[in-house]
Amino acid sequence: MGTTWRSPGRLRLALCLAGLALSLYALHVKAARARNEDYRALCDVGTAISCSRVFSSRWGRGFGLVEHVLGADSILNQSNSIFGCMFYTIQLLLGCLRGRWASILLILSSLVSVAGSLYLAWILFFVLYDFCIVCITTYAINAGLMLLSFQKVPEHKVKKP
């Protein structure tokens, strides 16, 4: 009936920690690039493979949408990496809960993250014409978390008449 704690599972833990680490790395790269325009990140392999260019683009904040809808000063106009950190933390915490609502929230948040990943992948390839190793890896992590979320849907017992 109620919600109880459980282990999130090794795979969910690994995916969430990897996603969190990549999101924190993206924040670091963006901050370093803001301080020094000549900063070259480890993920900057060439002119068409540059994560720092992607993170510093207008689509690197609020998915490129928040500023135009809510304004540049909106609290939601944050680096996409901030949303990533929040998402991976929520996924890990919800993965520790056993209950119907936790499962529903896991699935819904996973679907939103995959939709966001598809949108950002489209921007990455067809607008920025770039290849971001960190971005592609987070998209794969999001897809993996979505698959895990669908596997973890609890079977509810049906009362026999």
From Swiss-Prot:
GO terms for cellular component: endoplasmic reticulum lumen; endoplasmic reticulum membrane. InterPro entries: VKOR, VKOR_sf, VKORC1/VKORC1L1. SMART domains: VKc. (S)-warfarin binds at N80, Y139. The chain crosses the membrane at residues 10-29, 81-95, 101-128, 132-153. One of its GO terms (molecular function) is quinone binding. Keywords: Disulfide bond, Endoplasmic reticulum, Membrane, Oxidoreductase, Quinone, Redox-active center, Transmembrane, Transmembrane helix. Its main location: endoplasmic reticulum. GO terms for biological process: blood coagulation; bone development; peptidyl-glutamic acid carboxylation; positive regulation of coagulation; regulation of blood coagulation; vitamin K metabolic process; xenobiotic metabolic process. It catalyses: phylloquinone + [protein]-disulfide + H2O = 2,3-epoxyphylloquinone + [protein]-dithiol; phylloquinol + [protein]-disulfide = phylloquinone + [protein]-dithiol. It is a multi-pass membrane protein. Residues 1-9, 96-100, 154-161 are cytoplasmic. Changing C132S: Loss of enzyme activity. It is found in: Endoplasmic reticulum membrane. Signal peptide: none annotated. Involved in vitamin K metabolism. Catalytic subunit of the vitamin K epoxide reductase (VKOR) complex which reduces inactive vitamin K 2,3-epoxide to active vitamin K. Vitamin K is required for the gamma-carboxylation of various proteins, including clotting factors, and is required for normal blood coagulation, but also for normal bone development. Partially oxidized VKORC1 forms a cysteine adduct with substrates, vitamin K 2,3-epoxide, inducing a closed conformation, juxtaposing all cysteines (S-S or SH) for unimpeded electron transfer. VKOR becomes fully oxidized with an open conformation that releases reaction products, vitamin K quinone, or hydroquinone. Cys-132 and Cys-135 constitute the catalytic redox-active center. Cys-43 and Cys-51 are the cysteine pair that mediates transfer of reducing equivalents during catalysis. Belongs to the VKOR family. This is Vitamin K epoxide reductase complex subunit 1.
